[in-house]
Amino acid sequence: TEKAKDQVRMAVAKAAKLEDLIPKSVPVERAAMVVGAGVGGMQAALDLASAGIKTYLIEATPTIGGRMSQLDKTFPTLDCSQCILTPKMVDVGRHPNIEMMTYTEVEKVEGYIGNFDITLRKKARGVLTPDEATAKGIVGGGCNGCGDCAEVCPVIKPNPFEMGMAPRKAIYIYHAQVMPLIYTVDFDSCVKCNLCVDACGDKKAIDLEMQDEFITVKVGTAILATGFDLIPIEGKREWGYKQFDNVISSLEFERLICASGPTGGH
């Protein structure tokens, strides 16, 4: 038909004016950011760092490890999850190309492919690391994970790592294998009685007036490994959760059967 002939002529005329597509190249920042420090995020960070790439490992909670650290055994070998996870956590903490930033969240992302400016919000932990203490001129100071502060803290709260089935203090660590081994102040619960400050003594690790900090890093790529959360099963009334004692969540079950859990695995 005449219409078909016109369409062919138009396509030929358009093709005659086409220009070659020339690939564009842009300089890429040789640094990477991994958001989420569960087992997936840690492995991604280790792979990048081992390839010689500076890597920022960002974790919103006070410790790396993610959900896997709450599990008892892993399929198919039934190995203890902590036995697999803890060496990897140590490798992350020791790797010279990994800058581990716990208790930190991504605030803003700007830039373009290969060149991103990431603004990070470093939440106030209330406790200085040894490096932070040294930077403030406190020789030999900073938290060493001794736990003296938690022993004297009068505030008792449910431990979210144990799914609320065990207590923790207002200054706390989730569990004994945390990385980094630095205590954190729950400012929503802290009554600022200063008992922890006195217990810390010459280490001067506790700063109850600490404020959030904003840090900007430049990276060429970002990996999102933010993991998962349980669905709010309280909304499913037909399941009987929180109505019957023998209805529990999968993570509560994991903590109950775990030898290091609140019931010692019983």
Q: Where are the language model's segments positioned?
A:
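A short, basic/flexible loop-to-alpha-helix module at the beginning of a structural domain
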Residues: 13-30, 129
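Non-heme iron-sulfur electron-transfer modules
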Residues: 22-24, 61-87, 101-104, 110-141, ...
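N-terminal Rossmann-like FAD-binding beta1-loop-alpha1 element of flavoenzymes
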Residues: 32-57
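A structural motif corresponding to the C-terminal end of an alpha-helix
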Residues: 91-99
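Acidic-histidine catalytic/liganding microenvironments
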Residues: 95-96, 146, 193
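Rossmann-like dinucleotide-binding core of oxidoreductases
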Residues: 100, 253-254, 261-266
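Central beta-strand plus flanking loop segment that forms part of the substrate or channel wall
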Residues: 245-258
